């Protein structure tokens, strides 16, 4: 994948017009196979590898300077200014993340949703490897130790609504998952993403969910090597029409030189908002996302980041 700088262009976000630098970048979308396949452990390659991929050039817009215009329940993602008591080396230790960082994450979530009644942490991933841009190579192993996991290059959404409940059941037991369903509250899934140092290469891009149509999304049932089941979403560049001549209409954004104080919260499912899963033609309130390469940054320090996935009840 590659990218080149182009001119600054005016972008419309709701009723607000902003001037934003634009990159032309190539992203790995999903290309459905002619013959549907049953889920298997190899479906991890649909996120990290070369199978069923469609390389598409898109415009990527820098939010730096107007990041406050993006809201989680309007666009599917939001940036927050934060401070953490965690040192970078603390993220080498799972127990420190769980004991010190998870409470910080809860505080940040409550800044957006002060009415939150319960927060269930589904785990964390610390990334510290080079983005794989040669998709002819096998998918990287998923169970590498901390900081050995590379950024995810495939456009995706972490969980479907049902996938969130499946992961909750695996983490805490089916009884708790069933209790959460039975309470009937609004339930949301998030990825809380933060660099451990300033991002000089392989940044993370996110899509304004208002530019996504339900036909662009493909639910993927997954079976992991340990037998655990899940369900997430891979994304087609143009679900409504297939001709290659029609450009992808997704509105992509990233933050140039995102720092450890620039927290990114990405909504991945929402029982009260993302109703495309239940109703044909319903709203897509989640944000597809993917990492991408910046040319000329090959010698920059490897991107190090942490993401915490959680489910909240309102």
Stretch-by-stretch model annotation:
Residues 1-33, 314:
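Eukaryotic N-terminal targeting leaders
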Residues 24-28, 33-37, 49, 61-238, ...:
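Non-heme Fe(II) oxygenase catalytic core, chiefly the N-lobe of the double-stranded beta-helix
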Residues 237-314:
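Catalytic core of Fe(II)/2-oxoglutarate
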Residues 10, 17, 135-136, 270, ...:
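C-terminal His-loop and adjacent cap/lid subdomain of alpha/beta-hydrolase
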Residues 18, 31-56:
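Small-residue-rich
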Residues 16-19, 67-74, 299-302:
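Short, surface-exposed loop and linker segments with low hydrophobicity and enrichment for Pro/Ser/Thr
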Residues 54-55, 65, 310:
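N-terminal regions that are enriched for targeting/export leaders
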């Amino acid at each position: 994948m590659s990218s080149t700088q182009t001119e600054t262009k005016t972008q419309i976000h709701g009723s607000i017009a902003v001037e934003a630098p634009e990159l032309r970048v190539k992203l790995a979308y999903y290309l459905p196979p002619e013959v549907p396949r049953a889920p298997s452990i190899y479906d991890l390659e649909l996120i990290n590898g070369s199978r069923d991929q469609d390389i598409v050039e898109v415009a990527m817009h820098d939010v730096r300077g107007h990041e406050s215009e993006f809201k989680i329940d309007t666009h599917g993602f939001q940036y927050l200014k934060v401070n953490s008591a965690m040192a970078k080396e603390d993220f080498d230790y799972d127990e420190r993340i769980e004991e010190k960082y998870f409470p910080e994450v809860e505080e940040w979530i409550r800044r957006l949703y002060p009415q939150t009644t319960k927060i269930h942490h589904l785990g964390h991933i610390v990334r510290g490897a080079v983005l794989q841009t040669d998709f002819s190579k096998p998918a990287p192993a998923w169970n590498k130790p901390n900081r050995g996991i590379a950024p995810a290059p495939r456009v995706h959404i972490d969980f479907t609504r049902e996938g969130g409940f499946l992961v909750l059941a695996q983490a805490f037991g089916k009884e708790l998952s069933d209790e959460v369903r039975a309470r009937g509250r609004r339930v949301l899934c998030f990825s809380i993403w933060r660099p451990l140092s300033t991002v000089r290469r392989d940044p993370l891009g996110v899509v304004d969910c208002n530019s996504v149509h339900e036909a662009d999304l493909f639910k993927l049932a997954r079976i992991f090597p340990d037998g655990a089941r899940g369900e997430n979403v891979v994304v087609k560049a143009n679900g409504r029409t297939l001709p290659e001549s029609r450009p992808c209409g997704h509105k992509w954004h990233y933050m140039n030189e995102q720092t450890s104080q620039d927290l990114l919260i990405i909504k991945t499912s929402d029982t009260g908002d993302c109703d495309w899963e239940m109703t044909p033609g319903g709203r897509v309130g989640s944000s597809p996302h993917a990492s991408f390469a910046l040319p000329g940054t090959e010698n920059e320090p490897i991107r190090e980041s942490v993401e915490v996935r959680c489910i909240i009840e309102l």
